[in-house]
């Protein structure tokens, strides 16, 4: 039997104009940026990638349209170097994640400390829609404590690679299998959901992995877990392992990917394509070292895979609020290029891009920012701007000119931007002054400039106008 390559369904697919304020790299503030509204373009639905081909067998295995999220900010995220969540903050984060719509919320082991146990019990009493899990070692002492906290499920883990068996717990595979079965049967006897996961799965022997997973599947584990504990796996390795495992076990498959080599999102997506059912995430990807699959990044990827499923299940407009909450709690700034919520995620600057975006946003966007309650921006105050962006901005300022005049005004803005950085206010002043000169027939200066700037501006303006007259792109 030949398994055809997977088809990757794509999503379907609102503008605004910036100058970068001084705090641009600090807090993502858009003050000083001006919105440029474009016509709303229809986003035709597409259930599969038009550039792919029908791959029925792989589609049968794929869970990209029916995945579940195990949100681990309050477990993996608590292992982030900067993290300290008191009880009130944990409850606030748990409620926010529940409101967003995650399927599960995973908490630090109640065995870690007395406060961890008290926090676990407190969150279990909140009555959230999401199932509450706790993460423990594959040991009966931990299991006995975990089942008394009120959790809906227990996530059990033990290292299976030769590295961890030799240098961590010192147990062999026979011990691991027997311990796993004992813990699983005990937890299930309490009517609680249980997952068994190997640790460092991708550096474990495949025969050992399949043997232990098959054994726990037979005793009724709810999920088996694959963990790329050191972030070494590639998407291809993930797909192949999950596909093989899918043929061995009948239970659900959970996956946990660290981001040490930058593959956590791609690995999560490939795992779903191969038949995994659950993905571990954390807000902003926080966790040990480089962290794990970020919730926002996974949402971005899955919106491209099945927009309607994601929109129907998760309150996407809550994403930024959650990320701001966690970022403040762990005292980090949200990166300027963060998936979806980063300052630049939907900012367009190049003239060619701006023209197309103004006509139809899907030309340079695969995700509609409005789906996440975000805005797009066209940055027109730069040497890279194009006359279509200046025309759109002038019309927003209710200043009508001919296309030739818009182009001449654009040349003046580009000339000034070649001399020094310009702000939105500078660009607006040039547009307004140019329009006033047209109406009055005068030739007053467009901006207050030093003598040196005036000379440089005149030279640049002449150069650009000559190039424009010659039909060259400017």
Swiss-Prot record:
Pfam families: HCS_D2, HMGL-like
Disulfide bonds: none
Main location: mitochondrion
Enzyme class: transferase
Positions of the Pyruvate carboxyltransferase domain: 67-320
EC number per UniProt: 2.3.3.14
GO molecular function: homocitrate synthase activity; metal ion binding
InterPro entries listed in its UniProt record: 2-IPM_HCS-like (IPR050073), AIPM/Hcit_synth_CS (IPR002034), Aldolase_TIM (IPR013785), DRE_TIM_HCS_fun_bact (IPR048253), Homocitrate_synth (IPR011872), LeuA/HCS_post-cat (IPR054691), PYR_CT (IPR000891)
Record's protein name: Homocitrate synthase, mitochondrial
Species in which this protein is naturally found: Penicillium rubens (strain ATCC 28089 / DSM 1075 / NRRL 1951 / Wisconsin 54-1255) (Penicillium chrysogenum)
């Amino acid at each position: 039997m030949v398994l055809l390559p997977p088809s990757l369904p794509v999503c379907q697919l609102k503008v605004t104009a910036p100058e970068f304020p001084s705090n641009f790299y600090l807090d993502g503030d858009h003050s000083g940026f001006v919105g440029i509204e474009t016509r709303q373009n229809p986003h035709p639905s597409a259930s599969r990638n038009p550039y792919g081909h029908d791959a029925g067998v792989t589609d049968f295995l794929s869970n990209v349209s029916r995945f579940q999220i195990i949100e681990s900010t309050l477990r993996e995220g608590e292992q982030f170097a900067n993290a300290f969540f008191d009880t009130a903050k944990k409850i606030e984060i748990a409620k926010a994640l529940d409101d967003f719509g995650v399927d599960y919320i995973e908490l630090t082991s109640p065995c870690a400390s007395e406060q961890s146990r008290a926090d676990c019990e407190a969150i279990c009493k909140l009555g959230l829609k999401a199932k509450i899990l706790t993460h423990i070692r594959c040991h009966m002492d931990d299991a006995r404590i975990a089942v008394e906290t009120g959790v809906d499920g227990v996530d059990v883990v033990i290292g299976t690679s030769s590295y961890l068996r030799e240098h961590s717990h010192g147990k062999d595979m026979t011990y691991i299998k027997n311990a796993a079965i004992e813990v699983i049967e005990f937890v299930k006897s309490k009517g609680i959901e249980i997952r068994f996961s190997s640790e460092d799965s991708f550096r474990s022997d495949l025969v050992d992995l399949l043997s232990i997973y098959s054994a726990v599947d037979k005793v009724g584990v709810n999920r088996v877990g694959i963990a790329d504990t050191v972030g070494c796996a590639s998407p291809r390795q993930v797909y192949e392992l999950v596909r093989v495992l899918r043929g061995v076990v009948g239970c659900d498959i959970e996956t946990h990917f660290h981001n040490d080599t930058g593959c956590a999102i791609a690995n999560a997506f490939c795992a779903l394509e191969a038949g995994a059912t659950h993905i571990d995430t954390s807000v902003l990807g926080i966790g040990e070292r480089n962290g794990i699959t970020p919730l926002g990044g996974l949402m971005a990827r899955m919106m491209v895979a099945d927009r309607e499923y994601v929109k129907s299940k998760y309150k996407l407009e809550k994403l930024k609020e959650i990320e701001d909450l966690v970022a403040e709690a762990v005292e980090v700034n949200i990166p300027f290029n963060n998936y979806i919520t980063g300052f630049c995620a939907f900012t367009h600057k190049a003239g060619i891009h701006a023209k197309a975006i103004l006509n139809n946003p899907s030309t340079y966007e695969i995700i509609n920012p409005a789906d996440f309650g975000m805005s797009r921006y066209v940055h027109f105050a730069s040497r890279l701007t194009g006359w279509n962006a200046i025309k759109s901005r002038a019309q927003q300022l209710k200043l009508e000119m001919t296309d030739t005049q818009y182009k001449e005004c654009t040349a003046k803005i580009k000339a000034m931007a070649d001399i020094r950085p310009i702000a939105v206010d500078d660009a607006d002043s040039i547009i307004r002054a140019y329009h006033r000169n047209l109406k009055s027939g005068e030739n007053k200066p467009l901006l207050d400039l030093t003598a040196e700037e005036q000379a440089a501006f005149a030279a640049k303006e002449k150069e650009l106008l000559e190039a424009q007259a010659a039909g060259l792109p400017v």
